[in-house]
Amino acid sequence: MAKEATRVRRRERKNISSGVVHINSTFNNTMITITDAQGNAIAWSSAGAQGFKGSRKSTPFAAQVAAEDCARKAQEHGMRSLEVEVCGPGSGRESALRALQSVGFIITSIRDVTPIPHNGCRPRKRRRV
C-alpha cells in the first residue's frame, strides 16, 4: 500500500500592523510568541526549536536567535509595531528584546507580567553547590 502524499498547508498572509510579543523566559528555555491584539498566535519560536539542546537553550544567544526567527515570521504578515510582555526569571529576557529591536520593530510598551506569589506555594529547596 502506498502512503498518501501529505499536503503542505501554505500560510495565508495576514495584514496585521501591530501585535503583542510574549517572551516566556525560564531557567531552561526561552519561548517567544507573537500574537495579534485578540491573542491569536501569528508566529512562535523557542531556543529548542532553533536546534539548541540541553544547557545551551538557556543562554542569551539562544534567546536572541529565537527572537530573530520569530520576528522574521511576523514581518511576513506585515507587522511593524509591537507591545512586549516579558514573563519569567530566565537569562534570555533582555537579549530577546534587543533582538526584536534590531530586526526593525517599533516597540511601543514593555510590561513585566511575571507572576509573584503573595506567599503561595512552598518554593523548591535551595541549591547547595
Swiss-Prot record:
Domain of life assignment: Bacteria
Keyword Ribosomal protein: yes
One GO MF term attached to the UniProt entry: rRNA binding
Keyword Ribosomal protein listed: yes
InterPro entries: Ribosomal_uS11, Ribosomal_uS11_bac-type, Ribosomal_uS11_CS, Ribosomal_uS11_sf
One biological process term in Gene Ontology: translation
Entry keywords, A to Z: Ribonucleoprotein, Ribosomal protein, RNA-binding, rRNA-binding
GO cellular component, one term: ribosome
Similarity field: Belongs to the universal ribosomal protein uS11 family.
HAMAP family referenced in this protein's UniProt entry, alphabetically: Ribosomal_uS11
Protein function: Located on the platform of the 30S subunit, it bridges several disparate RNA helices of the 16S rRNA. Forms part of the Shine-Dalgarno cleft in the 70S ribosome.
Subunit structure: Part of the 30S ribosomal subunit. Interacts with proteins S7 and S18. Binds to IF-3.
Protein name, UniProt field: Small ribosomal subunit protein uS11
Organism: Bartonella henselae (strain ATCC 49882 / DSM 28221 / CCUG 30454 / Houston 1)
Gene from which the chain derives: rpsK
